[in-house]
């Protein structure tokens, strides 16, 4: 009887508990929007909590990079997707963000029976069951994990792009519209990776 209970407990702990999805870079003026999805069992969800996984915005870049390999190792599956600045300008940020999420979900080996999406907006193209959790990256471990995966992936891209777009301090601002970034846009002009739909005329003159 005891062995049966222990076996049942292990089955519960190893069962997929959460499939969380989140995006980063939605408000930036340069570069793509990234999304990530992370699949966790009940057991590994608890372990990642113990490691300190939480909303990526509340972690230092160093801590996010330290947590990333742990998340990838302990996740049952994960996927990363992105939508380019051009797609954002053509489709609008909401549709482009949804597209990046769908691309991330398509990287999974199996279609999940249910996903948990960060924020209040439905992922409209998704045909399966979904839940929306406002501030989900602070409440749901799989979403917090996804936010870290997406954030590190996007930050790594920004670091690589710094070499080509050195006049915009992309490494420092990560593509967001800081005063310094706008000053450099006025000085150097806009690039093919700037989101033109996010820039006002006053930002360019």
Swiss-Prot record:
Keywords for the protein's UniProt record, in alphabetical order? Cytoplasm, Endonuclease, Hydrolase, Manganese, Metal-binding, Nuclease
User: What GO CC terms are in its UniProt record?
Assistant: cytoplasm; ribonuclease H2 complex
SS bond partners: none
Reactions catalysed according to its record: Endonucleolytic cleavage to 5'-phosphomonoester
What GO annotations for molecular function exist for this entry? manganese ion binding; RNA binding; RNA-DNA hybrid ribonuclease activity
- Using the record's annotation, list all stretches that form the RNase H type-2 domain: 16-205
Cofactor(s), by name: Mn(2+); Mg(2+)
What Gene Ontology terms for biological process does this UniProt record contain? DNA replication, removal of RNA primer; mismatch repair
- So what EC number does this one have? 3.1.26.4
Predominant subcellular localization, coarse grouping: cytoplasm
Domain of life the protein comes from: Bacteria
Protein residues bound to a divalent metal cation = 22-23, 118
What PROSITE patterns does its record include? Answer: RNASE_H_2
This entry's comment on the bound cofactor is: Manganese or magnesium. Binds 1 divalent metal ion per monomer in the absence of substrate. May bind a second metal ion after substrate binding.
Localization:
Cytoplasm
Task of the protein? Endonuclease that specifically degrades the RNA of RNA-DNA hybrids.
Q: Which family does it belong to?
A: Belongs to the RNase HII family.
Q: What is this protein called?
A: Ribonuclease HII
């Amino acid at each position: 009887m005891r062995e049966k209970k222990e076996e049942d407990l292990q089955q519960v702990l190893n069962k997929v508990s959460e499939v969380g999805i989140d995006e980063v870079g939605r408000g930036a003026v340069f570069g793509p929007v990234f999304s990530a999805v992370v699949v966790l069992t009940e057991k590994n969800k608890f372990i990642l909590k113990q490691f300190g996984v939480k909303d990526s915005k509340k972690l230092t870049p160093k801590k996010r990079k330290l947590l990333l390999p742990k998340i990838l190792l302990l996740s049952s599956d994960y996927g990363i997707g992105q939508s380019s600045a051009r797609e954002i300008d053509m489709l609008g940020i909401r549709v482009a963000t949804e597209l990046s999420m769908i691309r991330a979900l398509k990287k999974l080996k199996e279609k999940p029976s249910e996903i948990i999406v960060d924020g209040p907006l439905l992922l409209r193209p998704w045909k399966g069951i979904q839940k929306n959790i406002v501030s989900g990256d602070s409440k749901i471990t799989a979403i917090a994990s996804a936010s870290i995966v997406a954030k590190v992936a996007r930050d790594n891209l920004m670091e690589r792009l710094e070499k080509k777009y050195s006049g915009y301090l992309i490494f420092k601002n990560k593509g967001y519209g800081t005063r310094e970034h706008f000053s450099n846009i006025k000085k150097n002009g806009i690039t093919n990776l700037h989101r033109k739909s996010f820039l006002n005329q006053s930002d360019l003159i």
